[in-house]
A protein has these predicted regions:
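Catalytic DNA-binding helix-loop module of base-excision-repair DNA glycosylases/AP lyases
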Residues: 26, 33-70
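C-terminal accessory module of base-excision DNA glycosylases/AP lyases that mediates lesion recognition
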Residues: 63-147
Length: 147
């Protein structure tokens, strides 16, 4: 299904009509498994695709971060839209914080092996929350095993 519509999807991307692309091609994509065709929501796949096309505007989102922000029972794409918008607003209102963070990274990484100046702010936030979310998952696992 997606392969047949590649040109149409590319046109939507060029027009930056990202919600329309999701609604038309990824919210109920027809997936063939063996001899059956079934509808499947591909929100997670689509958000990874957006991130690949433009990592400066679209964050990568995985389930631990989605759950960390309290969206465990929400649809992936809607959660993504809210979290991505929140990241963008945080970045806009905290430019000086990112300048300070980059400065600290450069003091630690004097040879600039991390290339921190070229890492998008969205990626920095994603790394921070990925760490926090996975730490919370590990803590929850330990609490389950302790009881």
């Amino acid at each position: 299904f997606l392969e047949k519509n590649t040109q149409d999807i590319n046109t939507f991307f060029q027009n930056q009509d990202y919600f329309e692309i999701y609604k038309k091609y990824f919210s109920k994509a027809q997936i063939r498994r063996k001899n059956n065709t079934m509808g499947k929501e591909l929100g997670s796949f689509y958000t990874k695709l957006l991130n690949s096309f433009d990592p400066n505007r679209f964050t990568a989102l995985d389930n631990p971060i989605k759950n960390y922000f309290g969206f465990k029972s929400e649809g992936f794409f809607i959660s993504y839209c809210i979290i991505n918008k929140g990241y963008q607003q945080f970045i806009e209102t905290n430019k000086n914080l990112f300048i300070s963070m980059r400065s600290i990274f450069l003091q630690i990484d004097k040879q600039d092996k991390l290339k921190i100046c070229s890492v998008p702010e969205l990626k920095i936030l994603d790394l921070i929350f990925w760490y926090e979310a996975n730490l919370a998952v590990e803590k929850a696992k330990r609490n389950i095993h302790v009881r």
